[in-house]
Curated annotation (Swiss-Prot):
Organism the protein comes from: Staphylococcus aureus (strain bovine RF122 / ET3-1)
Annotated protein name in UniProt: Probable inorganic carbon transporter subunit DabA
GO molecular-function term, one example from the UniProt record: zinc ion binding
Pfam families for the chain: DabA (PF10070)
Statement: the UniProt record of this protein carries the keyword Cell membrane: yes
InterPro entries in UniProt: DabA (IPR018752)
GO terms under cellular component: plasma membrane
Lineage of the species this protein comes from: Bacteria, Bacillati, Bacillota, Bacilli, Bacillales
Function field: Part of an energy-coupled inorganic carbon pump.
Ribonucleoprotein among keywords: no
């Protein structure tokens, strides 16, 4: 039992190196380093480079591109270098330091000739003996790597590649439940037991190896310990050894990690995977592991050679000149080279890039207002701050009605604004919001796209239920969509007819004899479809939509807003009346919309439309787990229109005028249109006028927004008809880049709309409304930081990782991807499950960057004490900031910016 508990703990701790990977159909952005954020970004970068040869700093080409485009100010970088040198004193002639810095900052590689020079070997040997003990300790972690990594096979590749191929084969077979007609036998027992059953008959193993498999224990944990003991791995090194195996195929391991979280019967899936992988490694390595020695000394030697060569090359000191110095001087030179290595300068370039962007954001905000303090309405607020942040802070208003919790009806109607439209914080909404506000008396608001509703949706036109909230939060309620019984019966029959046609086609395609006949039967139709879709993508798509609407028209539906008893549901169905009031109140507070309501309030989720795109979910709402957020918008709008909810809100201090009507829509990000999801049958005269006004200007808004967006796509020149061109991109099945998605995302601004209104933030900023004056205890800010900001940071780091290390964290070229097992994509027919973004999602061309890989800048509009209180109360966020996984800046009421590093 003690051993099993130990193995469980080892695996639980080792999971930190991978991230749960959801199926591609419900793709949700994940921070690949979430489990490693207890360490600094720089330490994780060094560790990944050491153990997997993965560099997560922007490379030389990306840095040069940023400088050329004006995104990176070299003077900022030079100042960082100067500051770094002033922190240390080196007893080295200044001209050598200057030469070294001038050369290494270009990030040039050291030529191989320097490494191979005999004098470099002499210097390395000279230093090695004195430092051998220290270096052996430093390089100990290198030796806790999979045995198969250290053994080279006859083809000249590590034996771990053979292990990987075996694991890809078996993992694909286990996971595939949708594409194959036959699934893995005995998979219901467990992955490990199904593999034991089949592997005994797998002739890719020798007869002796198959006998070993047959004799394995039934308990995967016992198998894991047996293999670790066989390889003489010390118990304190178990975790590092297991981490090495998880990082070998982080995509497949991440998919199993995700499934282990979703289903109780698969909770030990990673244990099964590791047991199988370790057995396969043992079988393939055989007795060769005995020849694998702990080569700390050779690694130390190699490190010294690299460092000596770096000093000689960057300082322009020939190795024979270096040898003329005494040992102590040589040690000083090499210590300097080790301290000032190339990755230190890569990190400085990254910081300079981020500081340049931070400065540009400041300038945009300042330039957007003649007086920032005036734009922030500071005359309305008199803030008394005590030096002790723990003491109370009072807020007094010149107009006391502005935040009076017992608001009267008089101050609730905004007669100057026709409509208020609340958009998801998604960066793609920023340009759209800007164009809407420029088109008329419309106000826009930013809030996370799930609108604070922790729900699982059960829509009539979707095969599976979907958790419509951020992936790090489990749903607490289920909301069902339903319609009139007769209409539903007709719709279900139509669905079954369509499903049976597709099922029959799939059945014929996946079976031997019928598949021979299928080309003859389907060839003419599919050929015609191919031609039409290729030549006229927009028209063919529109025609298909018309046919679908005619033959499979979704009936008018309602939602189970009120609590219902459903014994088949594992979640409560619907809300109680008090829960409806609470969620409505919370959402309105998060939108900073508790007074001055316009006659027409639109809650706008967002969705993306593309054709033949396995990654379509990556373009959907990240706050809704990779799905459109119109469902959540409709639900909240319906709740806010209920008289009993409004009465409850009034008792809580929020009065919504009777003339104010809530509606729901979806912002289609691939075409920049606004599609109505829910508009009440009865509108007040003012609401109707606002509704019609918004519809009247929407074509112009779409044209302007599409033109701005299409100008950024690399394959488009001047566009005369931007709306039609955007529709073509969304319909073209050959288009690898229907839209840029969230590429170039760089900042998250939390504050009142006046702070950024009218400012062109280039579609790079998440915008969330917030007024610190109405958040006395910091609860709202903490909610925004813990939810929307966390989602945005995950999105940001996934784009970052897919750009700086596409071979490890990206998903490669879309043109060569293969959808596998119904869960993800591979490159070719046997690779790791590619869990990041495709090359086309972050690059404009093979050598032209589009996404700028910088860490998220979070800007909070609030006094310093509010931010300090947040950092004190939210350790998780404070750790992200202090360990450099994001950058934090604040702006106070006087317009003073402060960086929190």
């Amino acid at each position: 039992m003690t051993t099993q508990l130990n193995i469980n703990l080892v695996i639980e701790n080792a999971k930190r190196v991978i991230t749960p990977l959801s199926p591609i159909s419900i793709f949700a952005a994940r921070n690949p380093w979430e489990g490693l954020e207890a360490d600094t970004f720089e330490d994780v970068a060094k560790w990944l480079r050491d153990v997997r040869d993965v560099d997560i700093f922007p490379n030389k080409a990306l840095i040069e591109s940023a400088v050329a485009r004006g995104e990176l100010d070299e003077s900022v970088f030079n100042q960082l270098v100067t500051d770094m040198l002033l922190e240390h004193h080196y007893n080295i002639p200044q001209h050598y330091i200057n030469l070294y810095i001038d050369n290494i900052k270009t990030l040039k590689d050291v030529p191989a000739s320097y490494m191979n020079h005999s004098n470099v070997d002499v210097v390395a040997d000279l230093l090695l003996e004195k430092s051998k003990r220290d270096m052996a300790e430093s390089y100990h972690h290198y030796d806790v790597r999979p045995m198969s990594d250290a053994i080279i096979d006859e083809q000249g590749e590590p034996l771990s590649e053979q292990v990987n191929r075996q694991m890809i084969k078996w993992t694909k077979l286990y996971i595939d439940q949708f594409l194959s007609s036959w699934t893995m036998p005995k998979r219901e027992q467990s992955f490990y037991h199904a593999w034991l059953h089949l592997a005994q008959h797998d002739h890719s193993f020798t007869k002796a190896q198959r006998q070993v498999i047959k004799d394995l224990p039934n308990d995967p944990k016992m198998t894991i310990e047996s293999v670790l003991n066989h390889f003489s791995i010390a118990q304190e090194d178990y975790q590092a050894y297991v981490e090495g195996h998880l990082l070998a195929l982080p995509g497949w391991a991440g998919m199993l990690y995700y499934r282990s979280q979703q289903h109780h019967f698969e909770q030990h899936l990673l244990t099964d995977y590791l047991a199988i992988r370790l057995v396969v490694e043992q079988l393939l390595v055989g007795d060769e592991f005995k020849s694998v020695t702990k080569d700390c000394e050779s690694r130390s030697e190699n490190w010294f050679k690299q460092t000596v060569a770096s000093w000689c090359y960057y300082s322009d000191m020939p190795s024979d000149v270096l040898l003329q110095h005494d040992v102590n001087e040589i040690q000083t030179f090499i210590h300097f080279a080790a301290t000032m290595n190339k990755n230190v300068f890569k990190n400085l370039w990254l910081i300079a890039w981020e500081m340049t962007y931070e400065s540009q954001v400041k300038q945009k905000i300042k330039a957007g207002h003649e007086s920032l303090a005036g734009a922030l309405d500071v005359n309305q607020v008199n803030v008394t701050e005590n030096d002790n942040a723990n003491q109370s802070h009072s807020v007094s208003l010149n107009d006391t009605q502005a935040v009076d919790e017992n608001n009267s009806e008089l101050n609730q109607v905004d007669t100057s604004t026709k409509a208020q439209i609340a958009f998801c914080i998604d960066v793609r909404s920023e340009p759209f919001r800007r164009h809407i506000e420029a088109a008329g008396p419309f106000e826009t608001i930013g809030i996370a796209g799930f609108f604070g509703l922790p729900i699982q949706k059960d829509a009539v036109d979707e095969q599976f239920k979907h958790d419509s909230l951020p992936v790090m939060v489990p749903p607490a309620y289920r909301i069902k969509e339903f319609a009139d019984r007769y209409d539903m019966n007709v719709y279900r029959q139509q669905q079954q007819t369509m499903s049976s046609m597709f099922y029959t086609f799939k059945l014929m395609k996946n079976n031997v004899m019928p598949s021979l006949l299928l080309p003859e039967l389907s060839g003419p139709f599919l050929s015609l479809s191919t031609i039409v879709n290729t030549i006229m993508p927009r028209k063919s798509r529109a025609s298909l939509q018309k046919i679908k609407q005619k033959w499979l028209k979704k009936p008018e539906t309602k939602l189970t807003i009120d609590r219902e008893f459903d014994r088949t549901s594992d979640l409560p169905v619907g809300f109680t009346e008090q829960e409806q009031i609470d969620f409505a109140l919370q959402a309105l507070k998060l939108m900073d919309l508790t007074e001055a309501f316009a006659p027409f309030v639109v809650l706008a989720g967002h969705a993306s439309h593309s054709h033949n795109n396995p990654h379509h979910a990556s373009l959907e709402c990240g706050a809704c787990g990779g799905a459109s957020s119109g469902f959540n918008a409709k639900l909240l709008a319906m709740i806010c229109n209920r008289p009993n909810v409004r009465q409850g809100l009034k008792q809580a201090g929020v009065y919504i005028p009777e003339t104010t009507v809530f509606a729901a829509a979806e912002h289609h990000t691939s075409t920049d249109t606004l599609a109505w999801v829910y508009v009440p049958d009865t509108l007040s005269a003012l609401a109707l006028d606002a509704y019609e006004s918004l519809n009247d200007v929407m074509p112009m808004i779409s044209e302007h927004a599409n033109r701005e967006r299409l100008d950024k796509l690399p394959t488009i020149g001047r566009v005369n008809h931007p709306v039609e061109e955007a529709q073509r991109f969304a319909s073209d099945w050959s288009e690898v880049r229907p839209e840029w998605g969230l590429a170039k995302n760089a900042s998250f601004i939390i504050g009142r709309r006046q702070l950024t209104k009218g400012i062109d933030l280039e579609g790079r900023t998440f915008l969330h409304n917030y007024d610190w004056r109405k958040d006395k205890d910091g609860t709202l800010l903490n909610t925004i930081i813990s939810g929307p900001v966390l989602v945005a940071q995950w999105i940001n780091l996934q784009y970052y990782a897919s750009t700086v290390a596409p071979h490890f964290y990206g998903s490669g070229n879309k043109a060569t991807q293969t959808v596998t097992s119904g869960v993800g994509v591979m490159q070719g027919n046997a690779s790791d499950l590619m869990y990041g973004l495709s090359w086309q999602s972050v690059m404009a061309a093979d050598r032209t960057m589009y996404h700028s890989p910088i860490r998220l800048l979070v800007v909070i509009q609030a006094p310093d004490y509010v931010v300090a209180r947040l950092l004190a109360n939210n350790e998780h966020f404070a750790r992200k900031a202090s360990n450099h996984w994001l950058r934090l800046m604040s702006v106070n009421e006087e317009g003073r910016f402060k960086s929190w590093i």
